[in-house]
């Protein structure tokens, strides 16, 4: 697959080239999505400049190259053995919390809880831009799940 990594922190000039990368594998709770559209979230710009690097560097398997991006819309290409909600061909949108699976590329792996069905009345571009708008709602949802699952 093609992707656009960064090799160091900095301004937009750190996006130097598009390169060939391996398509990510998925685990039993994940979905592989062929990305149709991705959006640039403000946190992506901050991460590119080094914001939160102490935390993010501890979470990443390798420091660089790093594929940024988290918000997407696309089409399901593969589902893990424990995924029941989605099937190949489903149109989805979502936001990844995985620091090792960015979205400035052609494919990304998502936990099944990080994506949902793309609304039929939205284009792929429109759906990819929704995720930042719902960040507050997602935070509340994750908090409620954590509180009530105990």
What are the residue ranges of the model-derived segments?
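Short structural boundary motif marking the start of a folded domain
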Residues: 1-4
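Short N-terminal binding/cap micro-motifs at the start of the first secondary-structure element
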Residues: 10-16, 42-43
